[in-house]
């Protein structure tokens, strides 16, 4: 039973801004949760409530979200059974907040950051009440098998561009994906060895300054285009000895360089007043992706087009979707209504699952199940602004999605998730298996 939800503003996430953390006091003890924060956010995401008071944290404070927990949510939680996850989530989202857009519940009154912190803490309390691990409890909530469980392939973001880096590179993330490993533990070893090899290659080619790391632990050397980044990755994978065992994934984050008036994409968007020679139409971008997939071992492309460019998403999925995972992040924002539209338009074939995009554990599970029911892949994801909370590590095992991206094997807030997955793999023993190259298949 819930006794008293306590909360604190002053924990920082990884970019040095405050975020919401909750301590949920129950008859079983105290259960804590902290929420992450994105940088390149989709316009259809549930609202992350910030104070916009420029005198505190340059407007990034979360006092209003904290106040909403204290004055609106907390009084309604006292005495409730923490095992009633769906009932409590729906109460917060639909009754206490109640804000809505054409895409569903928007959390614009209380803030998705306020609601999600409580939702995560309640989930942890529910697991304790059921005397089980968090990953098995969430699996039960989702109606999944808890006897044999799946460890995910890590998608390690090792080269940064786009809005995450100060270089010229337009595409936001280049990831290494160790699909050829026999276990999660070995996959992380493959990934770490490629990462350190890449660091040496970057240092030789671009200088020691180029090995500074970005928000997610990846490198941001002065790379000019995707070909250069991919050549560097292929060379590092080969030098580390993992050719054919480690593949490549990209997050383009194309909404960041889309011009809605001209319906074009500027691959030189970080150069002010550029000569427009790298401006592409949607079709030209489709052709570029097809060319890259033919030349490099790319198995997944996330956000290849703007969040409203349904037409070109569908073209690309039709062209290469059989062999390559086309992932919707800004396109879908973990929103079941957006997923339904994408299914109707055959726009993509995979969901990027970010719990803070939708704002409650119940809705995140719903988005995952809808995607899996329609034979999509699902990649569980961190945000670029993270805390040491490891909830998503348990979530990816619970939902059997077979793939997770939570940064490079660098920076403690990233490695915290990978370390939790090491622990889960160890605890499962023979009852856990590694997704490997079957990460796109239904592992239910």
UniProtKB/Swiss-Prot annotation:
It is an enzyme of class 4 (lyase). It is a peripheral membrane protein. Transmembrane segments: none annotated. It is found in: Cytoplasm; Nucleus; Cytoplasm, Cytoskeleton; Cell surface. Pathway: Carbohydrate degradation; glycolysis; pyruvate from D-glyceraldehyde 3-phosphate: step 4/5. InterPro entries: Enolase (IPR000941), Enolase-like_C_sf (IPR036849), Enolase-like_N (IPR029017), Enolase_C (IPR020810), Enolase_CS (IPR020809), Enolase_N (IPR020811). The modification Phosphothreonine is found at residue 337. Substrate binds at residues 164, 173, 302, 329, 381-384, 405. It comes from the Eukaryota. Its main location: cytoplasm. The active site is at residues 216, 354. A motif (DKSLVK motif) lies at residues 275-280. One of its GO terms (biological process) is glycolytic process. The modification N6-acetyllysine is found at residues 131, 373. There is a cross-link at residue 136 (Glycyl lysine isopeptide (Lys-Gly) (interchain with G-Cter in ubiquitin)). Glycolytic enzyme that catalyzes the conversion of 2-phosphoglycerate to phosphoenolpyruvate. In addition to glycolysis, involved in various processes such as parasite development and invasion. Plays an essential role during ookinete invasion of the mosquito vector midgut by mediating the interaction of the ookinete with the midgut epithelium and, further, by binding to mammalian host plasminogen in the blood meal, whose conversion to active plasmin promotes the invasion process. The pentapeptide insert motif is required for the stabilization of the apo-enzyme in an active closed conformation, independently of Mg(2+) binding. The motif is also required for homodimerization. This motif is only present in Apicomplexa and plant enolases. Belongs to the enolase family. This is Enolase.
């Amino acid at each position: 039973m819930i006794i008293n939800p306590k909360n604190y503003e002053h924990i920082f996430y990884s970019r040095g801004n405050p975020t919401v953390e909750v301590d949920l006091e129950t008859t079983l003890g105290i259960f804590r949760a902290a929420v992450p924060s994105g940088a390149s956010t989709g316009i259809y995401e549930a609202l992350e409530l910030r104070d916009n008071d420029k005198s505190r944290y340059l407007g990034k404070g979360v006092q209003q979200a904290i106040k909403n927990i204290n004055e609106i949510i907390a009084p309604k939680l006292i005495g409730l059974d923490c095992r009633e996850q769906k009932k409590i989530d729906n109460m917060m989202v639909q009754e206490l907040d109640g804000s809505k857009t054409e895409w569903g519940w928007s959390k614009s009154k209380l803030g998705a950051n306020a609601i999600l912190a409580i939702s995560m803490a309640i989930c942890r309390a529910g697991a304790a009440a059921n005397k089980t691990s968090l990953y098995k409890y969430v699996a039960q909530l989702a109606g999944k098998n808890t006897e044999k469980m799946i460890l995910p392939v890590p998608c390690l973001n090792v080269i940064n561009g786009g809005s995450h880096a100060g270089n010229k590179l337009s595409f936001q993330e280049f990831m290494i994906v160790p699909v050829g490993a026999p276990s999660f533990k070995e996959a992380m070893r493959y990934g770490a060895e490629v990462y350190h090899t890449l660091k040496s290659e970057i240092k030789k080619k671009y200088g020691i300054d180029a090995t500074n790391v970005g928000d997610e632990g990846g490198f941001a050397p002065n790379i000019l285009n995707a070909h250069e980044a991919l050549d560097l990755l292929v060379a590092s994978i080969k030098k580390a000895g993992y050719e054919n065992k480690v593949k490549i994934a990209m997050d383009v984050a194309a909404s960041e360089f889309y011009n809605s008036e001209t319906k074009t994409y500027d691959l030189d968007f970080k150069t002010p007043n550029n000569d427009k020679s790298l401006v592409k139409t949607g079709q030209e971008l489709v052709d570029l992706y097809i060319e890259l997939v033919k030349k490099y071992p790319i198995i997944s492309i996330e956000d290849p087009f703007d969040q409203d460019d349904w037409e070109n998403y569908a073209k690309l999925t039709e062209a290469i979707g059989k062999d390559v995972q086309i992932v919707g992040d800004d396109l879908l924002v973990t929103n079941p209504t957006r997923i339904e539209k994408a299914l109707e338009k055959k726009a993509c074939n995979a969901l990027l699952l970010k719990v803070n995009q939708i704002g409650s554990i119940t809705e995140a599970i719903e988005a995952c199940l809808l995607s899996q029911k329609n034979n999509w892949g699902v990649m569980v994801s961190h945000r670029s602004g993270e805390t040491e909370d490891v909830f998503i590590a348990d979530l990816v095992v619970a939902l059997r999605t077979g793939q997770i991206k939570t940064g490079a094997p660098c920076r403690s807030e990233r490695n915290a998730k990978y370390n939790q997955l090491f622990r889960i793999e160890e605890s499962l023993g023979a009852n856990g298996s590694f997704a490997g190259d079957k990460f796109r298949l239904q592992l239910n």
